[in-house]
Amino acid sequence: LEILVYINGKFYPRQDASISVFDSGYLLGDGVWEGIRFHKGKFLFLGPHLERLFWGASQIDMDIGKTMDEITEILYETVTQNKMETGVHVRLIVSRGIKSTPYQDPSFTISEPTIVVIPEYKQPSPDTQKNGIKLVSVDIIRGSSKVQDHRINSLSKFNCIQACIDAHRKGGDEGLMLDPHGYVSTCNSTHFFMVKDNSVLTSTGDFCLHGVTRQNIIDICKTNSIPIYEKNFTLSDVYECEEAFVTGTFGGVVPVNEIDGHELKVLGENSIAVLLQSCYNDLVESESSN
């Protein structure tokens, strides 16, 4: 099945989809992106995704050159061109554009932003959803926003890639990252939650991406009277938790079966993670039917 990729108003077969070597996204990681799920004919939680995209662009003084409505039209045109209906994960990428020379100064940009939409059929693994993933704490931290603001969904993922490599070297599926003060922040590609004393805890959010699924889970907890706290906690606290799970656009709610050698129960009796998985799946179906 041939997948067509959108690049600046045109569609190209996947094998022919390419950008200039002078593109600022390729040269410098200069741009922003979103991963968005397309389910039963609708892009899920599109408003928060586009708000984050445009906010991130504003933080790096980048004019996307399109309105949110125009980006929405591009997204739907892409899945229409591909005759896609459901089970799709889309990567929306906006770079600053073409550079006159390989140099970081934005004033050396000589084109409009490069807008790319990559649609792919993707479904989370049922085995992973049921049995969970293994986390390991990594040496790479989420640093100060004065170094790089991790609330921005930047094309430059070097920090996360380093953490991913470290996690894999240690035998983990994901790396659990600390913030500059030694508190647990997030994972390299997902957000971390733990359950302790029948309460759900996640980080303050000061040193991680403002996750759309993360916020949905926080809202679900509040709606269902599940105590939820955004606060600082340490690895020692994590080792004493009863359950843990990670969240993301692609996987939704995924249980954690082990953290640094500490085994955890996965989706057991009276599991809060089970409840949240169910509530999140209900939210997805509700969102797609509206």
What residue spans do the PLM features occupy?
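Conserved alpha/beta cores of soluble small-molecule-handling proteins
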Residues: 1-176, 180-181, 209, 218-290
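Glycine- and Gly-Pro-enriched alpha-helical subdomains that act as flexible
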Residues: 176, 183-205, 210
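Secondary-structure junction motif
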Residues: 213-214
